[in-house]
A protein has these predicted regions:
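Short active-site segment of divalent metal-dependent hydrolases/proteases
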Residues: 97-105, 249
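Active-site alpha-helix of zinc metalloproteases
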Residues: 93-94, 242
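Histidine-centered, transition-metal-coordinating active-site segments
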Residues: 1-80, 88, 115, 121-154, ...
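Active-site-flanking alpha-helical
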Residues: 105-109, 113, 253
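Short, functionally critical alpha-helical segments immediately adjacent to catalytic or ligand/cofactor-binding
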Residues: 38, 94-96
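Basic, low-complexity intrinsically disordered segments
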Residues: 84
């Protein structure tokens, strides 16, 4: 008899999954397989090919788009779930759908759209009206709170539930487990606005009236219309696997793209990596200590080393968190009144010691680099011009 894998007892059960119209007898697939296929064949998924990450896709044919990132997240997540004994179909469905609502131009696109929808910048005909019960900012009335906010994970849910049509019907009719995983792959809200200082908005430095009448980034449109999908009864360990895989993929492609764009030298990264992963320990096979002088060979070897290290740490961490000594099955975990706290403990910086320092290094050298800032500035400009053109 084959030995059970570490978290096979926590595997999500497709037979217990809930959606509006379950698969009928003529469908060869279970509900999670159907979720995966519907996402994969949707227009929203195909559009990911035209959405870039940190750099514009046209800058280099080998730099990533949101689609290639999604496929990498799926591959990493499937590897982890396979080793743990979790449901591969649910894992893949969540991974393929997690970014279908993402803005173009990466997180700068998301940031600008959120500013617009929160009235941080005013465009008549779009985000402010006259004679309404809306919030007053700088003497003009902006959108009511119930229409405010943009965040890509919430938008992904909106696309899956409402905006996409399938066979003439509204929405993809995905299972609650898949939608939950898509929603919870990142934070549900923004932190404190970084542009407010003593009640004044730094974004309005050239404006006569700089007071901010809306200090909170509202997401009320989403929470009012899609708040039901926050129900913790539909949590799965598979959703945590995808959330961690998303972070792993982001670190991985930041490093690769940074090397290709010459933002980080191979020598510097080699030293940083040696310090971070501690190659002298027995965790990494001895033969992998040798790096090639060829850039592409170096990137290939580095990628395998880096991802394998993170995947190994993730498997170990999740086994410790959800092993049989703690929970008999997923139902027992879901009934745990401290489930929300358990979920918050599944963070990449807790999984991999030193990740916060690595992330800070990558942010300083790549995301905050002159090249990335130029690209972000262009993206910001393009989105603003498009808004003015369409309003």
């Amino acid at each position: 008899m084959d030995q059970l894998k570490p978290l096979e007892h926590m595997k999500a059960d497709s037979n217990k999954a809930i959606c509006k119209n379950p698969p009928n007898g003529n469908d060869f697939r279970n509900i999670f397989q159907r979720d995966r296929d519907r996402i994969m064949y949707s227009k929203s998924f195909r559009r990911l090919a035209g959405k870039t990450q940190v750099f514009f896709a046209g800058n280099d044919d080998h730099l990533r788009t949101r689609l290639t990132h999604t496929l990498e997240v799926s591959q990493i997540a499937r590897t982890i779930s396979s080793q743990l004994g979790l449901d591969l179909d649910l894992t893949e469905a969540i991974a393929l759908g997690h970014d279908i609502g993402h803005a173009p131009f990466g997180h700068v696109g998301e940031r600008v759209l959120n500013y617009f929808s929160n009235g941080c910048e005013l465009y008549k005909g779009f985000n402010y009206r006259e004679k309404t019960d809306s919030i007053v900012v700088n003497g003009v009335e902006i959108l009511p709170i119930e229409f405010m906010g943009y965040k890509h994970n919430w938008q992904s849910v909106r696309i899956a539930v409402d905006l996409t049509r399938h066979r003439g019907k509204q929405g993809l009719d995905l299972s609650r487990n898949t939608i939950f995983g898509i929603l919870y792959h990142t934070a549900l809200s923004y932190g404190k606005c970084p542009h407010i200082s003593a009640g004044y908005c730094k974004l309005r430095e050239r404006s006569k009236e700089r007071k901010c009448g809306n200090p909170i980034f509202h997401l009320d449109y989403y929470t009012n219309n899609y708040g039901e999908y926050q129900d913790l009864r539909y949590y799965s360990v598979e959703s945590s696997v995808v959330a961690l895989s998303d972070e792993i993929a982001q670190r991985h492609h930041d490093i690769e793209d940074g090397i290709r764009a010459s933002l980080i030298s191979e020598a510097e990264l080699r030293l940083k990596l040696m310090d971070f992963i501690k190659l002298s320990t027995s965790e990494i096979p001895e033969e992998k200590h040798t790096f090639s002088n060829d850039k592409e060979d170096f990137i290939t070897i580095l990628s395998g080393l880096f991802v394998n290290f993170y995947v190994s740490k993730t498997i170990t961490y999740l086994t410790e968190q959800f092993g049989q000594r703690k929970y008999k099955n997923i139902e027992e975990l879901i009934l745990n009144p401290d489930l929300d706290t358990v979920m918050k403990n599944i963070e990449i910086y807790k999984v991999v010691e030193g990740d916060e320092q690595l992330h800070r290094f990558l942010k300083e050298r790549i995301l905050s680099s002159h090249m990335a800032q130029v690209m972000d500035g262009r993206a910001d400009f393009l989105i603003r011009r498009l808004f003015k053109a369409y309003i």
